[in-house]
């Protein structure tokens, strides 16, 4: 088992990251398969102690499925499912670490669902978040461009809905163009 892709991948994590992955796997939102939880629980002590002792697949199978005969195809499927969840965990870590991504996806979601009640609070929180960003690399301006574009889409969507230009009339076309230009120049240089 130690030569499998999932085991080798999990070996790269620190104990802290392994604990976070364990919490991720325990979440019913991300994982509804209790056998995957069991598999990880069996692997965790070996991973945390960095033991070189081999883990026979048949022994692990016997712990997870005590009443069933070893089935290599099902065991590989279980390992593959754990690997997919691990990949999802890695992506989730990046998402959680980037509040601008989160704000951008939130604005997209509000726009696609046409949830007018959240418009003002989300736009103001996005503006506060943008103002607090210290790093202003070219990717920052790309995300700013996306945020401004989503704000524009939200604003124009609600103006269409109410057929008036009072509450949402501050269109941000100049900001959209400015952020896209800065991103382009930053990438070009």
Q: Which residues does each PLM region occupy?
A:
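Extended alpha-helical scaffold regions
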Residues: 1-189
């Amino acid at each position: 088992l130690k030569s499998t892709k999932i085991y080798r991948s999990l070996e790269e994590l620190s104990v802290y990251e392994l604990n976070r992955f364990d919490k991720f796997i325990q979440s019913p939102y991300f994982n509804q398969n209790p056998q995957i939880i069991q598999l990880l629980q069996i692997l965790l002590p070996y991973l945390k102690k960095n033991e070189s002792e081999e883990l026979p697949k048949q022994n692990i199978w016997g712990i997870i499925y005590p009443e069933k005969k070893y089935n290599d195809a099902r065991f590989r499927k279980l390992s593959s499912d754990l690997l997919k969840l691990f990949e999802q965990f890695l992506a989730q870590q990046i998402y959680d670490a980037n509040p601008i991504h989160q704000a951008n996806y939130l604005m997209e979601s509000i726009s696609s669902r046409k949830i007018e009640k959240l418009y003002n609070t989300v736009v103001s929180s996005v503006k506060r978040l943008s103002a607090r960003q210290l790093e202003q690399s070219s990717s920052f301006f790309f995300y700013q461009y996306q945020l401004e574009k989503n704000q524009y889409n939200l604003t124009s969507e609600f103006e269409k809905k109410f057929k008036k230009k009072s509450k949402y009339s501050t269109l941000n076309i100049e900001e959209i163009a400015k952020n896209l230009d800065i991103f382009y120049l930053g990438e070009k240089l």
